[in-house]
């Protein structure tokens, strides 16, 4: 069975993430969406909230080959511990590729057992970023349905509109 890992912070999960996960599921037998923590980032949502929201969104789509997990550690370590041979990384533009390629080189030096697959973002999601969504959610009048699922928009607005205004 060909299993792939799609890691990210998902703060929050966007249509861009979902598109990449769906496309990865066409290539692999199983895809694990891994909600990970990066100590260099400041999160709007807690790790539990990010996991639960990502899980709810994926579950609502009914895709049987896609699973959600969370991990607080090195992504390569998770892949090795769980016998996962591939890490899928989305690439929006050249700066994403440069960053992800450096990560690939390091991972490959540490363990050639796990390979990295780069998927370019679909045109319609090239400029969809979680940090952009967090900035836009401050204005409750914006319709963010082209960036995030309605479930995510409702959750963010109900939870954070008072804190962010």
UniProtKB/Swiss-Prot annotation:
Keywords, ordered alphabetically: ATP-binding, Coenzyme A biosynthesis, Cytoplasm, Magnesium, Nucleotide-binding, Nucleotidyltransferase, Transferase
One matching Pfam family: CTP_transf_like
Q: Name one GO biological process term.
A: coenzyme A biosynthetic process
Q: SUPFAM superfamilies, alphabetically? A: Nucleotidylyl transferase
Q: Which domain of life is it from?
A: Bacteria
The organism of origin for this protein: Borrelia hermsii (strain HS1 / DAH)
Q: What is this protein called?
A: Phosphopantetheine adenylyltransferase
Marked site positions, Transition state stabilizer: 17
Q: Please give an example of a GO cellular component term from this record.
A: cytoplasm
Q: Which EC numbers characterise this protein's activity in its record?
A: 2.7.7.3
Q: What does this protein do?
A: Reversibly transfers an adenylyl group from ATP to 4'-phosphopantetheine, yielding dephospho-CoA (dPCoA) and pyrophosphate.
